[in-house]
């Protein structure tokens, strides 16, 4: 086809595409998916395009749409993470993008390949533009309350344990310390006690003898006699 014919055809195709109800291919104008998940887009076409191959392509420029995946009869066709399946019975075809990434966002086309060169690249009236948006996924919940940064760790079998303070009463006799028990069990300790105990008793007896009350020698009074102070 001569370039002049293409230039004349393109405005006509654009005008035809603006006529309400003239879209042989229709679909959602915008779709939104989440990173890591799958996104399906369903496009409809007219009955006269039932036997034609259906294409899902990414819009690269004003006149170029790079094919990503194309149907093969009614069987599913796949290219990497993108698959397409034609449903001739209800005149629709479905495109599925798996494991979405942020780079998958952009402008795509639901398109029907009618076999002519100028229509394969400039199919204004045999395609439908779909804007794909991809949003980041939500972070997994790890048991922390949003906003406070405090992790809450709990065991399903844990239970509250109440401890009572130690209470000491007058009737409670504290146990001897390990040092005291070791001293009492030492034979050297008892030998030392047996040697010093008589000396201690003798000194105590002498002290009591010196401090005993004295009787008055001149009388028979039973009262003790004290020196005048």
UniProtKB/Swiss-Prot annotation:
Entry annotated with the keyword Iron: no
Q: What is its main location?
A: membrane
Top-rank lineage group of the source organism: Eukaryota
Q: Which UniProt keywords apply?
A: Cell membrane, Disulfide bond, Glycoprotein, Immunity, Immunoglobulin domain, Membrane, Receptor, Signal, Transmembrane, Transmembrane helix
Q: GO terms for biological process?
A: immune system process
Q: Does the keyword Cell division apply?
A: no
Q: What topology does it adopt in the membrane?
A: Single-pass type I membrane protein
Indicate the family of this protein. Answer: Belongs to the CD300 family.
Q: What is this protein called?
A: CMRF35-like molecule 6
Natural source organism = Mus musculus (Mouse)
Q: What lineage is this protein's organism placed in? A: Eukaryota, Metazoa, Chordata, Craniata, Vertebrata
